Amino acid sequence: MSRGLRVGPAGNSELFYEQGHKSTTDAFAWQRRLFGLDAFEIPFGRGISMTVETAGRIGLAAREADVDISAHAPYYVNLANPDEALAAASARYLTDSARLLQAMGGTRLVVHVGSPKGQTREEALERCAERLLMVRSALVKEDRGEIRLCLETMGRPSVLGTLEEILSLVRLDGSFLPCLDFAHLHAAQGGSLRSQGDFAQVLDRVEAALGLPRARESHMHFSRIEFGAKGEIRHRVFSDTGFGPDFALLAPLLVSRGYGGTLICESRGTMAQDAAEMKQALARARAGGLT
């Protein structure tokens, strides 16, 4: 592996603000000092308002703290939209996100691929495939070829994003990576990740589809999650032990299989603290022997 597994939060924890901090430029040194975290995901989920100048300042602060930056593109991207104008707007959200991510020095852009919207899933996937390749081509032409689109598994069966759908799209281009959101996988299948064997089956499928070297580079999200009959309801925190999945089951597998991508915690409000718990679980797995 070219690097070890990087671990960090999606956005700033409530604790960050409670301790008097306001600017994300302060977050990287803060999380390094308190928790030893070396990754951070910038949330553009509800829209892009950041300037390139601000992105540059964020990137400088992250580099000074040796924290890897990733970003999450807007949630409302739908590359499967049958309306060409709306699909083109979604593509622009991705290229705009990539422009800011590049200014921050990051390379991993998490993407929700979209929803069928009255089409068959097969038709929607075909549209997604075509438009993902168009976005990739645009990034290369804009000298942003280092940006890797990380296609996310989703928590509701009504949208595109089953593991098999994501893997089929990732195989389209060598720069694409899966974003394995284990909470979403758990929720979309009615609580499917209950044992270490369940997690192993997910990783086995990824490795079979992409090969072990590329699977090891996967971008990953983790939290506990509340779900219902239609899938995901809301992300939960690690102390909400009545909800799964349990990271202690996954940690030994990531260590024994040599995963070295990025692992982001999406707990609600305690993402830095829970990311630190994940980092500690990985350290215990390394120290205590591999399962």
Task: Annotate each predicted stretch with a short phrase.
Residues 1-96, 288-291:
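N-terminal pre-domain/capping segments
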Residues 1-2, 27-36, 50-70, 96-105, ...:
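Acidic (Asp/Glu)-rich catalytic clusters
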Residues 63-64, 80-180:
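Active-site acidic/histidine proton-transfer and metal-coordination neighborhood
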Residues 5-12, 38-42, 69-73, 109-111, ...:
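Hydrophobic faces of well-ordered beta-strands that scaffold small-molecule active sites
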Residues 18-29, 51-59, 120-140, 156-174, ...:
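Distinct, well-ordered alpha-helical segments
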